[in-house]
Amino acid sequence: MAEILERSGYLVKVRVEVPADRVKASYEALLKDLASRVRVPGFRPGKAPLKVVEARLGREALLQDLKERLVEETYPEAVRELGLSPVAARVVEQDLSEGEGFRYVAEVENYPEVRLPDWRSFALEVSPPEVTEEMVEKALEELRQRYAELVPVEREAQEKDHLFVRTEEGAEFPIDLAKALPHVREALLGKKAGDVVMVPVLNDKGEKVREVRTEVLEVKTLKLPELDEEFAKTLEAESLEDLKNRVRESLKRQAERAYEEARERAFLEKLAEGLEVEIPPSMLRAEERHLLEHLAEDLYRQGISLEAYLEALKVKGELEKFQEDLRKEAEKRVRIALAREKLAEELNPEVSEEEWQAYLQAAARAYGVSVQDLRRQFGEEGLARLKERLRQDKAVQEALKVLG
């Protein structure tokens, strides 16, 4: 039998009573299970009498194991019976007496109740997309940069040049002066083919530890193609004007996507800010751990451990700010997740089979696998979460249409 003793926001105090006959049956099952695994001198494995096993293991230890087993068995039944959706729980009281039932009290952090703000009255302050001629010209210039060629020049090296050099050890390699370390760039600027220069090598503190004799073999510069009809045709445009129109249309599509994404972001942030909810601490801690795991993965790819990164923040006196920012970001993400979930519950959009299949195909492409492999990797529960995410996406889009 289970009953709610006290309820305050997300925190629910629950009392569970287990009848004596079930306690007795669980104790006997526990003893038999242990007897099959415990070695008792003078008996073959699994053949020692239960009383002997009980005496060997000690009744107090057995009763502690019994309490844990009973909680494991009855807690899920109790929360189902009471209609709770726990995110965390702990047992705060236990009472197990000889020949009687087992009673315990658990403090449950229940999934929070959420109330949305009046989102239909939202005014989203997002500037509409605009594509200027200046943006078109910049995009065309970037195209020229992308199709530029390196050509040799017989002059001194300038800031954006590329040098091909050979060290005294015989190693030959190119150096892009625009991306070179400042002390390397300084040593090579103004040099031409045939010049020999001593390039300093610095330690972690920026101190010179030695010099490397380096010969400049060749100086090259980027030659940009002319923005003309011929260049347009190399990009499969019919004319220069056609190329400009294509670039303009591409920029408009990008601007429209950015605008829609900005509207969605502004809507969700406003929705989350106005959410009436008391979030259980365990949900926030879980999201903080999730964020730290992602950070650790990013740092690992750079050859840095999370521990070393946090220690460096501590040395610089920035650890407290990092932790505070982490807490704020975790709360923001949890609030947005709860807001999306509640909005989908309110609008209840339907996901057609065609939409679901298209979503699966897009997800499979993103993961670089087939739809069949995606289904296998995600499993039934993972696919259910994926479908719920699609349903929530549809709810957000429906809400944005309402706002116009």
Swiss-Prot record:
Main EC class the enzyme belongs to = isomerase
Q: Which reaction does it catalyse?
A: [protein]-peptidylproline (omega=180) = [protein]-peptidylproline (omega=0)
Record keywords:
Cell cycle, Cell division, Chaperone, Cytoplasm, Isomerase, Rotamase
Give the domain of life: Bacteria
For this record, the Gene Ontology CC terms, alphabetical, are:
cytoplasm
Supply the Gene3D superfamilies for this chain.
Answer: 3.10.50.40, Trigger factor ribosome-binding domain, Trigger factor, C-terminal domain
Among InterPro entries, the record links this protein to:
PPIase_dom_sf (IPR046357), Trig_fac (IPR005215), Trigger_fac_C (IPR008880), Trigger_fac_C_sf (IPR037041), Trigger_fac_ribosome-bd_bac (IPR008881), Trigger_fac_ribosome-bd_sf (IPR036611), Trigger_fact/SurA_dom_sf (IPR027304)
Q: What's the Enzyme Commission number for this chain?
A: 5.2.1.8
- Every copy of the PPIase FKBP-type domain together lies at 160-225
GO biological process entries: 'de novo' cotranslational protein folding; cell division; chaperone-mediated protein folding; protein transport; protein unfolding
Main localization category: cytoplasm
Any one GO MF annotation of this record = ribosome binding
Localization recorded for this chain is:
Cytoplasm
Q: Return the similarity comment.
A: Belongs to the FKBP-type PPIase family. Tig subfamily.
Return the NCBIfam families for the record: tig (TIGR00115)
What UniProt notes about the protein's domains is: Consists of 3 domains; the N-terminus binds the ribosome, the middle domain has PPIase activity, while the C-terminus has intrinsic chaperone activity on its own.
Q: What does this protein do?
A: Involved in protein export. Acts as a chaperone by maintaining the newly synthesized protein in an open conformation. Functions as a peptidyl-prolyl cis-trans isomerase.
Q: Which PANTHER family match?
A: TRIGGER FACTOR CHAPERONE AND PEPTIDYL-PROLYL CIS/TRANS ISOMERASE, TRIGGER FACTOR-LIKE PROTEIN TIG, CHLOROPLASTIC
Q: What is this protein called?
A: Trigger factor
Q: Which organism is it from?
A: Thermus thermophilus (strain ATCC BAA-163 / DSM 7039 / HB27)
